[in-house]
């Protein structure tokens, strides 16, 4: 009966890995940089539901300078309200600045991801390690 117990335990572990877990907080890339892509992962506050990436460019500049802001946020609307404030709108409407806001809801989705954080990668690793034992146990 031990092989059946191992099989049940393996299936239970697999189910835990494949089900979304609200217990951990969202992780986002966090930085404010000019012409760089080096950001650090940051665990967001429980009230933050999105990762945001904001790119501010000067379309008239021949140097193509830009500023990149990556952060945790409570909503994409909040980020847009912040970056499209009355102060910046004058520059945006006159064509001096261009602001692009992108939001997403998965860990580290606003920048380079960290290897091995995907639940599918974890599930695949579990199947590769437990698969032979489950097959050996048989029905």
Swiss-Prot record:
Membrane topology, from the record: Lipid-anchor; GPI-anchor
Record CDD domains: TFP_LU_ECD_Ly6H (cd23549)
One term under GO cellular component: plasma membrane
Region forming the signal peptide: 1-25
GO biological process, one term: acetylcholine receptor signaling pathway
Protein's name in the database: Lymphocyte antigen 6H
Gene name in the database record: Ly6h
Lipid attachment residues per UniProt (GPI-anchor amidated asparagine): 110
Pro-piece positions: 111-139
Location of the protein in the cell: Cell membrane
Organism ancestry: Eukaryota, Metazoa, Chordata, Craniata, Vertebrata
């Amino acid at each position: 009966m031990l092989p059946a117990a191992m099989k049940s335990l393996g299936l239970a572990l697999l189910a835990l890995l494949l089900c979304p877990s609200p217990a951990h907080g969202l992780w986002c890339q966090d930085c404010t940089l000019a012409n760089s892509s080096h950001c650090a992962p940051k665990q967001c506050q429980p009230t933050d539901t999105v990762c945001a990436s904001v790119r501010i460019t000067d379309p008239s500049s021949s140097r193509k300078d830009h500023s990149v802001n990556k952060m945790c946020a409570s909503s994409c609307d909040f980020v847009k309200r912040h970056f499209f404030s009355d102060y910046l709108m004058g520059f945006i409407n006159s064509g001096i600045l261009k602001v692009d806001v992108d939001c997403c809801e998965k860990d580290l989705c606003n920048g380079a991801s960290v290897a091995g954080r995907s639940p599918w990668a974890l599930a695949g690793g579990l199947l590769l390690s437990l698969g032979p034992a489950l097959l050996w146990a048989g029905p």
